[in-house]
Amino acid sequence: MFISLYKLGYIGIDEEENCYIDNDVLISVDRVLSLEFYLPKNQKDPNKENQKDRYGGRNLVFHVNGIYRMDEQLREHLDNNKDFDKLFMDVVKAGLLRSEKYDSTSPLTIGERYSREEVCRLLNWELKISGQNIGGYFISDSTHDTCPIYITYDKADDISETIKYEDRFYNPNTMHCYSKDGRRLEKKEMKKMFAGVNEGKTKLKYYLFVKKSDDEGISYVFLGECFVIKNSMKQESRLIDGKEKPIVSYDVRLKEPVDLTLYYSFVGTKRN
């Protein structure tokens, strides 16, 4: 059973398994199982760590003519080592059990927690990007027109002034956000991030993730899809180390309001 995992029907597998699937998902699955997802963005740079090597450096699975076939070396270990086989199946079963709390009809589940690197995979990005490089948002030609936005609501007192943004909720539907430090509206990154917003023809899909503070670790709560409010983008500046630094502010509105219990856990105000 380990040689051929299953044959893709391409049409109908979503109905059989009740899961969200399209061509981008299938390509992403291939890249993860072949470990290409973990290659460095600049493969010619010898200083870039090849994360593929962390996972053995070999494809776990090969996808040929619509059939996923397990790597022969991996299959041999499973056939000849009962302890390894048991541990392998425990991991698979644990993953399936853990997946039951997620909405299988959508890439992301509102109210669940995700690390920035997990979101890379779930949004079908071509490569894994480190959380440090993603920062508060990330867009590139390899992110399939998606733009996840990450907000740490209460900033620690000892963090750098350059990342001490004053993001805040206006209400359970709307949030005021900031770009990364040093950005200008007329520059390439901001033009790409807000392309089509004022014309009502947004180019990107935006996803909002929030955590209360860094005490919660590296994961953020997914609050849902959102859109940048028309004409909300403003060029501003902040005084950092005695110098005025440019920054862009903008407002986003969620398609669905934040659950009130969760909302007040962020803003720190008790309901009457």
Identify the function of each model-found stretch.
Residues 1-87:
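C-terminal helical accessory/scaffold domains
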Residues 1-10, 14-15, 107-219:
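Acidic, glycine-rich low-complexity segments with interspersed aromatic residues
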Residues 7, 11, 15, 25, ...:
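Short linear sequence elements within intrinsically disordered, low-complexity coil regions
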Residues 19, 97-102, 120, 147, ...:
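Generic recognition of cysteine residues
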Residues 19-21, 147-152, 250-254:
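Generic recognition of long tandem-repeat/solenoid scaffolds
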Residues 73-131:
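Extended alpha-helical interface modules used as scaffolds for assembling large macromolecular complexes
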Residues 213-272:
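Compact mixed alphabeta submodule
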